[in-house]
């Protein structure tokens, strides 16, 4: 009886478990194949992603790793080298990698209210930069600023439309604060749509543009048959399109351009056009030359050139529909649209645009810390001295994670900002890697010697077993390993 119950319990428990595949693992065919060039490049990138230290390996070892992962692939060491060279992925081939820093242009920034401790210097090599007027001590607050153009999180668009996040800043609203009755009493709800603001401050900043972007009621056709400044219906369609395509840059430049054309002073537009500026299609060349390396390493998808251009043109047509008057005036060309997108992509911080901060150039070991609020994005940013800064020294920030390997940093900088970094940290990291390579050479010779010794021993003793003395004590513990590329058991209750 007990045995029957035990079997029933076991069967019941077994029903609660499911064997599942993870990481999209599929058994590879054992039939020999000649892989497509894209498969080879993607596999090398995957190796680098899993272990960044492998980026410094020579072609021979890299080829061996590819073959080890895909024994059925018919691919030579020469082909691997040729493909990496063609796609600009040889780490020792920096001179042949595509850069576009020389195509980035900027102008003197008009009407900028600079912090007391810094001034702008324009140089031929680094473009515009911020330099210390006097000595700045470590930890000093150098300046703080609000966004020139604030962009709410694209991911929160549906929450904003449903009154569950602030219409301006995108901050998630609590159940009590989003309650219709309470928001009406506080005057934070929109009297036309279902959107709500989180505070009077956000409502005051956003109320005019909110009405123009989202309500044709407040933006009727002008008399005389002239076109609208902003077509709200077209904007709402573009907003949904951006969410569907996860196209943050198009979403952002639409909000930026709406701010520019409604700014009666005209200063915002001049300041945006004075920033470091490059066309998005030029930036794409760097991505394409890397076989989409950066995008693949970030888990994204790479469009082929024709698909990408089609997407840009679709986005451009939707952008034009939002601003019919600007189209009539000839203010929006496809070229200008591409420049706006490129400008946004190389200047934004946390999706927003800051005026003074955008003048900071890069260093992998920066002398400033730029801090943004993780809870209240509208609080802007604060810039502190990371160490003592000399008078006349350039202020720098880091565009990438300094903890990345030098190859990862170089790749991100080249693709996203168009230059190969030559800072002191990069030079030292490369020297350190070279020293490690040199020190590993004697170890390789020792390995060869051990193999020769074992071969000689085998010749002497033939098939006899070798007895090895077992240590009387062993304090180590073998590290447990789990493979995550095949099958695991998941509880389904």
Swiss-Prot record:
This is Histone-lysine N-methyltransferase SET5. Belongs to the class V-like SAM-binding methyltransferase superfamily. Histone-lysine methyltransferase family. SET5 subfamily. Its EC number is 2.1.1.-. GO terms for biological process: methylation; negative regulation of gene expression, epigenetic. It catalyses: L-lysyl-[histone] + S-adenosyl-L-methionine = N(6)-methyl-L-lysyl-[histone] + S-adenosyl-L-homocysteine + H(+). Coiled coil: none annotated. It is an enzyme of class 2 (transferase). The gene is SET5. Its main location: nucleus. Residues 116-400 form the SET domain. SMART domains: SET. It is found in: Nucleus; Chromosome; Cytoplasm. One of its GO terms (molecular function) is histone H4K20 methyltransferase activity. InterPro entries: SET_dom, SET_dom_sf. Histone methyltransferase that monomethylates 'Lys-5', 'Lys-8' and 'Lys-12' of histone H4 (H4K5me1, H4K8me1 and H4K12me1, respectively), thereby controlling gene expression and remodeling chromatin structures. Pfam families: SET (PF00856). One of its GO terms (cellular component) is chromosome.
């Amino acid at each position: 009886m007990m045995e029957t119950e035990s079997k029933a319990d076991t069967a019941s428990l077994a029903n609660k478990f499911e064997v599942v595949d993870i990481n999209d693992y599929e058994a590879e065919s054992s039939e020999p194949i000649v892989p497509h060039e894209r498969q080879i490049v993607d596999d090398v990138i995957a190796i680098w992603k899993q272990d960044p230290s492998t980026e410094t390996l020579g072609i021979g070892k890299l080829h061996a790793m590819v073959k080890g992962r895909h024994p059925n692939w018919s691919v030579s060491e020469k082909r691997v080298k040729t493909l990496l060279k063609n796609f600009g992925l040889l780490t020792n081939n920096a001179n042949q990698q595509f850069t576009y820093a020389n195509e980035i242009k900027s102008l003197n920034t008009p009407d900028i209210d600079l912090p007391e401790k810094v001034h702008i210097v324009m140089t031929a090599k680094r473009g515009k930069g911020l330099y210390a007027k006097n000595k700045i001590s470590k930890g000093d607050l150098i300046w703080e600023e609000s966004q020139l153009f604030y962009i709410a999180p694209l991911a929160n668009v549906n929450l904003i439309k449903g009154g569950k996040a602030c219409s301006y800043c995108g901050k998630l609203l609590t159940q009590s604060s989003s309650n219709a009755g309470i928001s009406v009493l506080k005057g934070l709800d929109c009297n036309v749509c279902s959107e709500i603001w989180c505070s009077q401050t956000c409502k005051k900043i956003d109320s005019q543009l909110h009405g123009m972007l989202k309500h044709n009621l407040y933006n009727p056709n002008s008399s005389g048959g002239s076109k609208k400044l902003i077509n709200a219906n077209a904007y709402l369609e573009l907003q949904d399109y951006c969410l569907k395509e996860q196209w943050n840059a198009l979403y952002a430049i639409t909000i930026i351009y709406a701010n520019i054309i409604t700014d009666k002073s005209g200063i915002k537009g001049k300041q945006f056009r004075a920033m470091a500026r490059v066309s998005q299609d030029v930036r794409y060349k760097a991505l394409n030359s890397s076989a989409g390396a950066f995008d693949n390493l970030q888990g994204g998808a790479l469009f082929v050139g024709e698909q990408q251009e089609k997407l840009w043109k679709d986005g451009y047509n939707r952008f034009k529909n939002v601003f019919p008057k600007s189209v009539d005036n000839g203010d929006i060309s496809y070229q200008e649209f591409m420049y706006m997108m490129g400008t946004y992509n190389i200047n934004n911080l946390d999706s927003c645009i800051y005026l003074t901060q955008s003048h900071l150039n890069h260093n992998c070991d920066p002398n400033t810390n730029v801090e943004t609020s993780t809870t209240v994005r509208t609080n802007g940013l604060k810039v502190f001295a990371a160490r003592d800064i000399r008078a006349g020294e350039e202020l720098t920030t880091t565009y990438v994670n300094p903890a990345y390997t030098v190859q990862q940093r170089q790749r991100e900088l080249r693709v996203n900002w168009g230059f190969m970094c030559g800072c002191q940290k990069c030079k030292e990291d490369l020297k350190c890697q070279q020293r490690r390579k040199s020190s590993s050479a004697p170890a390789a010779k020792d390995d060869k010697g051990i193999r020769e010794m074992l071969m000689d021993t085998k010749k002497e003793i033939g098939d006899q077993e070798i007895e090895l003395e077992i240590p009387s004590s062993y304090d180590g513990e073998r590290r447990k390993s789990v493979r995550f590329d095949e099958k695991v058991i998941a509880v389904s209750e």
